[in-house]
A protein has these predicted regions:
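Long, compositionally biased tandem-repeat segments
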Residues: 1-190
């Protein structure tokens, strides 16, 4: 990515060894915006993984959502990429949502959408998270960002496997010039 420094990732959810509920992964931080006139938006942080469930609970922690990419500078700058969603726990849980890519300024490329978090192989299949959308290209000139790829559903040997997450939409091209970003592929079922 042509974006600025990465933002902190979300923390992982705590693991539960008793009968309580496992922690949800933290949300990744949003990328900062580019300067008033020039500058690229920062990338969004990655979402934290959900905490593992114990043998006495059927539900673990969901993966945290990825942070959104920052917008590019008003005149010239690329949008930051969205952060990837965190993975689900080893029990029934959903992968985190991918963050949306940031929009470009008047000139620049939209940031790519973050990938959806994966479901984890378990006794029950965890669903993959939906991917983030690509950011819009520059208003005058620039390509839209690509949509992220949906998270893969968790595979299991009994009961139901998890569904794959939806792919993200591609960002629109510039109002005058620019190509639209491609849509992301959906994640496969477990």
């Amino acid at each position: 990515s042509a974006s600025a420094a990465m933002v902190d990732a979300g923390g992982n959810g705590g693991n539960e060894s008793g009968t309580g509920v496992s922690g949800v992964g933290g949300v990744g931080g949003a990328g900062g915006a580019g300067g008033l006139l020039f500058g690229n938006g920062g990338d969004g942080g990655v979402g934290g993984d959900g905490g593992d469930g114990s043998s006495t609970q059927d539900s673990g922690g969901d993966g945290g959502a990825g942070g959104a990419g920052g917008a590019g500078g008003w005149l010239l700058g690329n949008g930051g990429a969205g952060g990837a969603g965190g993975a689900a726990s080893i029990k029934v849980a959903t992968g985190g949502l991918g963050g949306d890519g940031g929009d470009a300024g008047l000139f620049g490329f939209g940031g790519d959408g973050g990938w959806g978090g994966r479901g984890v192989d378990a006794r029950f299949g965890a669903a993959g998270g939906a991917a983030g959308a690509g950011g819009a290209g520059g208003w005058l000139y620039g390509d839209g960002g690509a949509g992220g790829v949906g998270g893969v559903g968790g595979a299991v040997f009994s009961l139901s496997s998890g569904d794959g997450g939806a792919g993200g939409a591609g960002g629109g091209g510039g109002w005058l010039f620019g190509n639209g970003g491609g849509g992301g592929a959906a994640g496969g079922g477990g």
